[in-house]
C-alpha cells in the first residue's frame, strides 16, 4: 500500500499518469535523484488513500477534461498537507485552470527537461513553490483558492508581505528588523526566500514587483 511508503524527507512522491516504460523510468530517476520514495498510479483509476505529506505529480499529457475534474475533486477532499504539481503542462494551459487545482505548488511545462523537474522538486522539498514569475503574480493577486489551499508552502507569507511593504517605503534591513521586532539576519533570510519566490534579484526589482502586485 502506498500509505506504507515513507521517506527521509517526510514526503512521498506519487506520479499519476498512464503506466508505461517511460513513466517508470522517470519515476525511478526522480526517486534516485531526490533520495525519496514513491509510486506510480494509473491516472484512469480512482484513488482514495493519499498519504500525508504526499507530493502529487499529475501528468497533464495524459489528462482529459473528465480526468482533470475527477482528480481536482479528489484532491480537494484531502487536507493532509499534500502538494499538487502539474507535469508536462501545455504552454497554453490557462492560469485560471491552474488555480483550480487544489494544493497547487508547482507547474512543470512540457518543454522542460527532467533536470528542471528534479531542480524544481528539490525546491518543493525545501518548502518552496515552482512557478514562473507571471504565474506567481497571477496566483498571488487573483487566486483566493490558491491562498486557501496552500499550507506550509504559501507563495508569500504574511511576514514576507510585511517586509515587501517596508521595502516600498525605502526601509533598510535594520529599520525593518526594529519595526517588526526581529533580527537583521531574520530579515535577510526572509528577503532571500521572497526574492526566489517572486523571481527577482534585488530590492529595486522586488519593490517594482510589489508595486504591481501587492496592496498596501
From Swiss-Prot:
Q: Which GO terms describe its molecular function?
A: DNA binding
Under PROSITE patterns, the record lists: HTH_LUXR_1, HTH_LUXR_2
Q: Has keyword GTP-binding?
A: no
Q: Is Ion transport set as a keyword in this record?
A: no
Give the matching SMART domains. Answer: HTH_LUXR (SM00421)
Q: Which CDD domains match?
A: LuxR_C_like
* NCBIfam families recorded: PRK10100.1
Q: What is the recorded function of this protein according to its Swiss-Prot or TrEMBL entry?
A: The master regulator for adhesive curli fimbriae expression; necessary for transcription of the csgAB operon. Plays a positive role in biofilm formation.
Specify the protein name: Probable csgAB operon transcriptional regulatory protein
Amino acid at each position: 500500500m502506498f500509505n506504507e511508503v515513507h521517506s527521509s524527507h517526510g514526503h512521498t512522491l506519487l506520479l499519476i499518469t498512464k503506466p508505461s516504460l517511460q513513466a517508470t523510468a522517470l519515476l525511478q530517476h526522480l526517486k534516485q535523484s531526490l533520495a525519496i520514495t514513491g509510486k506510480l498510479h494509473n491516472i484512469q483509476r480512482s484513488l482514495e488513500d493519499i498519504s500525508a505529506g504526499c507530493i502529487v505529480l499529475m501528468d497533464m499529457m495524459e489528462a482529459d477534461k473528465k480526468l482533470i475534474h475527477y482528480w481536482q475533486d479528489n484532491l480537494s477532499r484531502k487536507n493532509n498537507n499534500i502538494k499538487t504539481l502539474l507535469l508536462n503542462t501545455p504552454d497554453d494551459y490557462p492560469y485560471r485552470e491552474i488555480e483550480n487545482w487544489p494544493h497547487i505548488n508547482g507547474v512543470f511545462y512540457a518543454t522542460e527537461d527532467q533536470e528542471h523537474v528534479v531542480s524544481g522538486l528539490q525546491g518543493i522539498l525545501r518548502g518552496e513553490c515552482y512557478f514562473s514569475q507571471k504565474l506567481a503574480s497571477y496566483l498571488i493577486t487573483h487566486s483566493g483558492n490558491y491562498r486557501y489551499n496552500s499550507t506550509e508552502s504559501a507563495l508569500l507569507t504574511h511576514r514576507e508581505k510585511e517586509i515587501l511593504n517596508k521595502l516600498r517605503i525605502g526601509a533598510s534591513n535594520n529599520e525593518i528588523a526594529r519595526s517588526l521586532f526581529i533580527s537583521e539576519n531574520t530579515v535577510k533570510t526572509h528577503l532571500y526566500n521572497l526574492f526566489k519566490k517572486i523571481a527577482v534579484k534585488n530590492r529595486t526589482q522586488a519593490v517594482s514587483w510589489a508595486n504591481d502586485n501587492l496592496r498596501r
